[in-house]
Amino acid sequence: MQSVTSVSGGKTSAYMAIHYPTDHYVFACVLTNHEGSISKDKALIQECQNRLPHFVASHEDDLTLRRILELEQELGKQIKWVASEFALEDFVQGVTDLPGYRSGKPRLFNSLTRFCTAQQKIIPIAAYCHNFIDGAKPVLMNLGFRYDEPHRVKNWNCKNDRHRMALSCPVTGGNWKYKETEWRISDFPLYRDRIINADVRAFWQKKKWDFPEVSNCRFCPFHTDFQLQLQAQQFPENLDWWMQLEAETGHTFGKRTIADRINQPLLDIFDSPCVCTD
């Protein structure tokens, strides 16, 4: 069985990649065509386009992308970049032509319909593992759940390791056919070895590597209000994407608008953070 590490660009997954070597490393990049999200670092854009030719911009922090590139050098092994054919806003606006995905009326992702994670992360990684690593056999995948995150391990079940794979395409006018398959077997080496956040931070402080204070996509609605407020100060240009989609669709990413969450006076730092890398 081939082993795979899914790296997110955050400090925990990078720690895991270094301390628990695997046969393959993969990074799923969340794409956007939003002009305000285009990096001002032209060299970074070129590096991203070398790996993803259709790359325009990402909802990831520039520092996240740089850390992925540097981690590849640290590992001495390729980190394969994967991404959806479509930008995230294409899924929101319902303009994709992917099989099995509804088109037409726009809708926003939320805690019940997290198609952002599914379409931009899980499906590209699963497709890569299925098509280029071990075919119909599942891969052993390291996931970066730490010992101080027991709820993430306890809430995990086998359904998270299954995916509907397309078996045939309707070239002759027929319908797409699918089969649900177990594409990965998840392993939690950090949890097993009782690695906690303090261990991870101490390691990177010693190496003098810095990471984004808030991991995963900028302004992810699954971040805490406190994290959103931090990002509003750092990335006002990217914030426009989220607020504009709420205005255009007449819906919100959660119970409150992004603007309400950012402008509220109370900073609650004890909410559960985003776990999009699940």
Regions of interest found by a model, annotated:
Residues M1-D278:
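Nucleotide-activated chemistry modules centered on ATP-dependent adenylation/adenylyltransferase
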